[in-house]
């Protein structure tokens, strides 16, 4: 009897919901002798860069990246992230007044929040870092502002305030509040 064997790599964000969704793969509960699934959690910009190199078979991506990879990856109908009335937040120190060319920390060049942010603030100077470091960078004065994503939008320092919701930028660009803000999804290699 011929045994078919296939290894499939799946990469996702370290968000609590993603960790939960992919736990069966991470613990080996979804694999058998015909199909071996492996899971890896990484920050979204690392995942985006991995897709540009074709590293994973299935990978979480920012929708801002998709125009760069659509010929190599197909979007899946599952595990997508949209915001409605909420989403990434531009944060600053409580008493900050932003200048036109302020320095901002973003979670990556190819992220959806970076794309949306660059449309709204074309003169801002972007610095890219892991999303877990953004709050600290604003508090320390390393940057003037930062865009928070994931769970960090729910619980950040009292020394900071929300300057602007990226949801509001999206609504202004879309001309309506009826369209959800596209953030990210899962893409599968077409090979």
Where are these regions (language model features)?
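Acidic, polar ligand-binding/catalytic clefts
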Residues: 58-89, 95-96, 151-164
């Amino acid at each position: 009897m011929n045994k078919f064997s296939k290894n499939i790599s799946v990469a996702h964000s370290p968000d609590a919901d993603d960790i939960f969704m992919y736990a069966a793969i991470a613990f080996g509960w979804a694999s058998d002798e015909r199909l071996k699934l492996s899971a890896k959690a990484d920050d979204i910009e690392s995942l985006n860069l991995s897709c540009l190199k074709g590293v994973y078979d299935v990978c979480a991506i920012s929708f801002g990246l998709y125009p760069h990879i659509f010929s190599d990856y197909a979007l899946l109908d599952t595990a997508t992230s949209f915001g409605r009335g909420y989403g990434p937040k531009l944060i600053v120190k409580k008493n900050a007044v932003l200048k036109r060319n302020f320095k901002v920390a973003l979670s990556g060049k190819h992220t959806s929040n970076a794309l949306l942010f660059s449309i709204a603030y074309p003169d801002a100077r972007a610095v890219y870092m892991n999303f877990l470091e953004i709050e600290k960078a604003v508090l320390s004065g390393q940057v003037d502002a930062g865009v928070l994503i994931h769970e960090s939008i729910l619980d950040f320092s009292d020394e900071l305030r929300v300057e602007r919701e990226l949801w509001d930028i999206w609504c202004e660009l879309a001309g309506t509040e009826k369209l959800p803000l596209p953030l990210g999804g899962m893409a599968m290699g077409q090979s």
